[in-house]
């Protein structure tokens, strides 16, 4: 941890939970003498190191979408960077230029006032906010060390704002942890889902499909809302049917009326990611398909492949739950039209679609 992080509440919380984990105080993360290794090896080294650092930027911000594709209007409460899980497709491998898991030590003293002000403003204006913590980190993978999600939930229930907090994760919920939380349908526990073979081979350290769905069912029974994100959908000849089976498992396990939304997004990646991921994880085969460069500079599957996958997944979801909000992540209006049969502009725009889903399911 940085010397400047010692006096903050989150630092004290992490130290109280760290047990026998070795702790070092360093002058500066920026000037830390990282091992002299190639970037892929340094990334792997960083998966086992947690840095507590005071953050100097904005904690509450807009999702880093792109003007080239339709964005959902998501807002981010930025609590840290990096993830101890090791998914071969993770964009963070090519996004940051320094290794290690990072938590912002000054989150509660300086970050929470930013978020609280936004929540109070939304309450005054009767304006819905959809906020998440899982853009640059898994929302719950470090919860046993930091307690950030639990503290956020407890603060959330004290503020009657028209806002949902979405906690995106690939880990399972501990039953004792879930039982001690104050239930609130404005809290959305969300799981990234994939075909079983992808989860097993490409999402190292994550919970199994069954563990994620069981956690979702427990969260729904406990009074929370849930969501699912099929992102990235990875297309091999055998995987589309496997994704449809996952849809069936969702609705066999989780009550549809507690699902606020389901997103669909196909594998896309910055060109640099392929080289880094294949060097770190040589057994991966997700980059062996045919890709084209999209409008955002990322590599994507050809449009007909994406639209067919989205069309079939959406059709299966609709067979189970016609009312559940389904949306595409980072796709053009043309793909929406071909895959889902409409464009969000016809329904007031994608942000409005999601706001209405939150109003209906989360009790806003």
Task: Outline where the language-model segments fall.
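Auxiliary Fe-S-binding modules of radical SAM enzymes
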Residues: 1-11, 251-364
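N-terminal alpha-helical interaction blocks
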Residues: 1-45
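N-terminal [4Fe-4S]-dependent radical SAM core
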Residues: 29-80, 94-103, 363-364
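Conserved Radical SAM active-site core
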Residues: 51-69, 91-190
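Short cysteine clusters
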Residues: 83, 87-90
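Hydrophobic faces of well-ordered beta-strands that scaffold small-molecule active sites
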Residues: 129-133, 165-167, 189-191, 226-230, ...
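Conserved radical SAM core fold
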Residues: 136-141, 172-175, 187-206, 232-236, ...
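Catalytic cores of alpha/beta
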Residues: 238-253
């Amino acid at each position: 941890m940085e010397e400047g992080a010692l006096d903050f509440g989150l630092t004290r919380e992490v130290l109280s939970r760290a047990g026998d984990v070795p702790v070092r105080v360093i002058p500066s993360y920026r000037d830390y003498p990282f091992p002299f290794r190639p970037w892929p090896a340094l990334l792997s080294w960083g998966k086992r190191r947690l840095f507590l650092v005071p953050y100097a930027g904005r904690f509450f911000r807009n999702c880093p979408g792109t003007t080239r594709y339709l964005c959902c209007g998501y807002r981010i409460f930025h609590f840290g960077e990096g993830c101890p899980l090791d998914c071969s497709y993770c964009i963070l491998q090519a996004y940051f230029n320094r290794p290690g898991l990072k938590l912002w030590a000054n989150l509660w003293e300086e970050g929470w006032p930013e978020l609280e002000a936004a929540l109070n403003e939304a309450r005054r204006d009767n304006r819905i906010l959809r906020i998440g913590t899982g853009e640059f980190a898994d929302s719950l993978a470090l919860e046993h060390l930091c307690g950030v999600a639990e503290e956020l939930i407890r603060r959330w229930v004290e503020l009657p704002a028209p806002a949902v907090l979405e906690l995106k994760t690939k880990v399972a919920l501990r039953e004792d942890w879930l039982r001690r939380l104050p239930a609130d349908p404005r809290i959305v526990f969300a799981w990234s889902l994939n075909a079983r073979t992808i989860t097993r081979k490409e999402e190292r350290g994550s919970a199994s499909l069954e563990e994620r769905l069981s956690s979702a069912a427990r969260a729904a029974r406990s009074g929370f809302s849930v969501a699912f994100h099929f992102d990235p959908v990875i297309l091999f000849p055998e995987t589309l049917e496997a994704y449809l089976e996952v849809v069936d498992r969702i609705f066999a396990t989780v009550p549809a009326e507690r699902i606020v939304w389901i997103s669909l997004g196909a594998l896309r990646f910055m060109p640099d990611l392929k080289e880094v991921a294949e060097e770190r994880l040589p057994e991966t085969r997700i980059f062996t398909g045919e890709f084209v460069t999209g409008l955002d500079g990322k590599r994507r599957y050809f449009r007909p492949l994406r639209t067919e996958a989205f069309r079939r997944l959406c059709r299966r979801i609709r067979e189970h739950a016609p009312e559940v909000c389904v949306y595409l992540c980072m796709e053009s209006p043309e793909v929406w039209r071909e895959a889902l049969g409409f464009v969000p502009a016809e329904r007031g725009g994608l942000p409005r679609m999601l706001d209405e889903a939150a109003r209906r399911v989360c009790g806003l």
